Amino acid sequence: DVFSGTGSVASAFIDKRLVVCDMMRSNYYAALCWFSPESIDYKKVEELLCYYNSYDASSEENYVSENFSETYFNRITCQKIGFIRENVENLYKLGTINAREHACIITSLFYAMDRISHTCGHYDSFIRDGKYEGCLELRMPENRYVLNCENKIYCSDSNSIAHLEEVDVAYLDPPYNSRQYCDAYHLLENIALWEKPEVHGVAKKMDRTDMKSKYCKSIKAAEALEDLVKKLRCRYILFSYNNNGKKLQCRSNAKLTDEDIIRILSIRGDVQVFTMNYRGFDAGKSELNKDNQERLFLCSVRK
């Protein structure tokens, strides 16, 4: 899974050997949580989650409360998020928890944040009515399943590691348009990295210059895809893309044409195209988003 995100596609193949990659640290932690073969002391993690849920951090200020209070969350929630993230990092540095346990707790924190965030589904902006609801509740991730001991998890630019692994199927689901994931999910990435940078503007975003994806840029997307496809070591390449085409908002326009995709995949082998209609995410505002098609381009690799 070359652009794994939170791992929804890879999870459908949980009984197989998985190689997953994403350049965002927040998604990397999710992948470690779901797919890493490292063992977990579930009793220890559950006890920590119970401790965090019952902890009163209302008298403590920290990086999160000082920078994000009364934005995506109220002050009390921000105080708790900051305390949990700092404590988890300290436990990991002390060796009290291993890498996967560390990732499980952070992933649980992200899911808890998403359930009560005062947003429309991402962190590009927040709802400014001051009506915060719900409390932060960390739950144990449901990852008690047998995993392949040869699973590999990467936090990297996909193009830089594509040549390292030999697989049966390489699934590619890159960004479709100019909307950078590091912009929409900057807060989760900030909490994941835990470097406590300065934040700016109403949305409280950190500097994301080094996090931008080439696949979101028209002049670089085709070049990046061709480089990736040439490096992959696999029997099949399954490429997912939609037909956003020309929308009223140019940011939503697809960065790769069908011609680009077929030309590039054909470098490696024969290409078939499968289509399925779907309703794009637009908060119900656009009639143009009702005729979208998800396309799957399947390349049977010959060279």
Question: Which ranges hold each PLM region?
Answer:
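A short acidic (Asp/Glu
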Residues: 10-13, 29-33, 164-167, 180-189, ...
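A short helix-to-beta-strand connector/capping loop
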Residues: 144-152
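Class I S-adenosyl-L-methionine-dependent methyltransferase module
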Residues: 17-19, 24-145, 178, 182-218, ...
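Class I S-adenosyl-L-methionine
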Residues: 255-303
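Conserved Class I SAM-dependent methyltransferase catalytic core
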Residues: 213-269
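Conserved SAM/SAH-binding loop
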Residues: 155-160
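Conserved proline-anchored active-site loop of SAM-dependent methyltransferases
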Residues: 1-13, 20-25, 163-184, 240-242
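General small-molecule cofactor/ligand-binding pocket signal
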Residues: 19, 152-154, 272-274
